[in-house]
A protein has these predicted regions:
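Long amphipathic alpha-helix in the N-terminal Rossmann-like dinucleotide-binding domain
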Residues: 1-16
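Rossmann-like NAD(P) dinucleotide-binding subdomain of oxidoreductase/dehydrogenase enzymes
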Residues: 17-160
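Short linear capping/connector segments at secondary-structure termini
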Residues: 1, 20-26, 211-215
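Short alpha-helical functional segments enriched in proximate histidine and acidic residues
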Residues: 8, 88, 200-204
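ALDH superfamily catalytic-core signature
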Residues: 116, 124-215
């Protein structure tokens, strides 16, 4: 989280500076990156700090105020993030955490309470966010559940392919929006791939994620 926030701060000056389209004797045309206003961040429970900081940090750096609401499974993350920014010296009133149910969230969006909405979560919930914002001209950014494929081609290193793709599918118990959800394997390698993948997964041990013996 610190690394991501620091990187975004480091690149902010270059990323936010005006883009000069034309500078001639007749015209100066430029694109200015101005704050949007109040950015509403709806963060998920998986990777709760990282997924939130991905929007919270750049929104604040760009001069916006931020309202954060977290998934019901990770409510305290929002409180702790606001506390951390406050202790770091962020002026009061620029970053707030709210506990909201789905109906209230959709009502605030539909009422035009925010200038931009960023949502990370399921496709179904993202559809409701989009519908709530319809007609308000509020910008909406949606990062929804993916259907990410993996491909194993003719010249693939089979052991490396198995290790990489199975890790991509199982990492964080598969609770990742960019996790591998299906794999396409060239016919010649298919049987060997399945056998190696099954053998690898059979070695996994389910259990308490805080215990080292758990895969």
């Amino acid at each position: 989280v610190n690394e991501r926030a620091s990187h975004m701060a480091d690149i902010a000056h270059e990323a936010l500076k005006p883009l000069i389209v034309e500078d001639s004797g007749a015209f100066e045309r430029r694109i200015l990156r101005e704050p949007l206003g109040v950015v509403f961040v709806i963060a998920p429970w998986n990777y709760p700090y990282m997924t939130a900081i991905n929007t919270v940090a750049p929104a604040l750096i760009a001069g916006n105020a931020v309202v954060l609401t977290h998934a019901t499974q990770s409510l305290l993350v929002g409180e702790r993030m606001v506390q951390a920014f406050t202790e770091a010296g962020l002026p009061e009133g620029l970053f707030a955490n709210l506990f909201l149910d789905h109906g209230t969230t959709e009502g605030l969006i539909a009422g035009g309470a925010f200038n931009f909405v960023n949502f990370t979560g399921s496709t179904g919930a993202g559809r409701r966010m989009e519908q709530a914002a319809a007609g308000t001209f509020t910008g909406v950014g949606l990062e929804l559940g993916g259907k990410d494929p993996g491909y194993v081609m003719e010249d693939a290193d089979l052991d490396a392919a198995v290790a990489t793709l199975i890790d991509g599918a199982m990492f964080n118990s598969g609770q990742c929006c960019c996790g591998i959800e299906r794999i396409y394997v060239i016919d010649r390698l298919f049987d060997d791939f399945v056998a190696k993948a099954a053998a690898l997964v059979s070695e996994y041990k389910l259990g308490n994620p805080l215990e080292e013996a758990t895969t």
